[in-house]
Swiss-Prot record:
One of its GO terms (cellular component) is mitochondrion. Its main location: mitochondrion. It is a peripheral membrane protein. This is Ubiquinone biosynthesis protein COQ4, mitochondrial. The keyword Isomerase does not apply. PANTHER family: UBIQUINONE BIOSYNTHESIS PROTEIN, UBIQUINONE BIOSYNTHESIS PROTEIN COQ4 HOMOLOG, MITOCHONDRIAL. The lineage of its organism: Eukaryota, Fungi, Dikarya, Basidiomycota, Agaricomycotina.
Length: 300
């Protein structure tokens, strides 16, 4: 006879993108000869508030935060874990972020329309001129081999309204990269996390900003070159989550930066020390010289 022991916690492999699923969605049963999982009836009886919603108890939410945080804040390239961490800590900041959106006419219109950026969206943007927000967003995605729908869906937030707020932040993150000409590499992802914390007070951005640099080979150089710029830009610029990006696809990206009160990092020597950033800026300069860039009132 084998003895099966129900466990609310399960063994997991932190290298797997799905390692948290047994932790929050199943009761695991161990025996001498086998390990199996079956749905937990207690979870299946909970109300689902939107498609894909996975309701969690407070204890499960805490475990999700710890499990995703241990790995996610050390490796910000693990988008699945960062997504889980941001949702499990959402109760701390999402209501405030939602209130920020309600404070501006543009933000209120976003919450009313609830637009989503999908793969179909970018097909329409490929015909725009270089230098427009929409076209540069397409170029940025293509350069990194990314697409809008590669972002993880929102699952663990109970309120449909706050779930959309999280989705909006998640879907527009790559537009922040585009706005500041930041490539999808670890140093620049961390720079953007610092900026997001300064701009929106996101806890997950703070955690990534504190622990993520431990993995950098040039920590001191990164700190000197990027942290002051990110903190200043996030603090002085408009709240990025309140921007209705879809209505600005055809706007010159330099003009948009001026409107939002933000600038790219033009500190002395930064381009020389960061090749990925330099490459994006050089492509832009070459297109400007050829007259193939939307004319903008911005130094380049």
């Amino acid at each position: 006879m084998t003895l099966a022991i129900p466990l609310e916690l399960s063994l997991f492999d932190p290298t797997s993108a799905d390692f948290l699923v047994p932790l929050i969605s199943f009761s695991a049963y161990f025996s001498v000869k086998s390990f199996t999982m079956r749905p937990c009836p207690r979870l299946l009886t909970r109300k689902l508030n939107y498609p894909g919603h996975i309701p969690l108890s407070p204890a499960q939410n805490a475990l999700l935060a710890v499990g995703s945080g241990v790995v996610g804040v050390l490796d910000v390239t693990r988008g699945d874990l960062i997504a889980s961490l941001s949702e499990s800590t959402a109760g701390i900041f999402l209501p405030a972020l939602h209130e920020k959106m309600k404070m501006t006419p543009e933000g209120r219109q976003i919450m009313k329309d609830r637009p989503e950026i999908t793969n179909k969206t970018i097909e329409k943007l490929k015909e725009l001129k270089r230098g427009t927000l929409g076209r540069e967003y397409v170029e940025w995605l293509g350069g990194g081999g990314l697409e809008p729908e590669s972002r993880a869906p929102v699952q663990y937030i109970d309120s449909p309204l706050l779930a959309y707020t999280m989705l909006r932040y998640r879907q527009t993150h790559d537009l922040y990269h585009t706005l500041f000409s930041l490539p999808p590499t670890l140093p620049h992802e961390l720079s953007l996390k610092v900026l997001e914390f300064s701009n929106m007070s996101l806890p997950v951005a703070l955690l990534s900003s504190v622990f993520g640099p431990l993995r950098l080979k040039r920590k001191e150089t990164w700190t000197r070159d990027w942290v002051p710029w990110a903190l200043r830009t996030g603090r002085e610029g408009r709240s990025l989550v309140t921007v209705y990006w879809e209505k600005r696809w055809e706007q010159g990206i330099g003009e948009l930066r001026r409107e939002l009160g933000v600038e790219r990092n033009d500190a002395e020597g930064v381009e020389a020390r960061w090749g990925g950033y330099r490459k994006i800026r050089e492509v832009e300069r070459e297109l400007r010289r050829k007259g193939e860039w939307v004319d903008e009132p911005e130094d380049w």
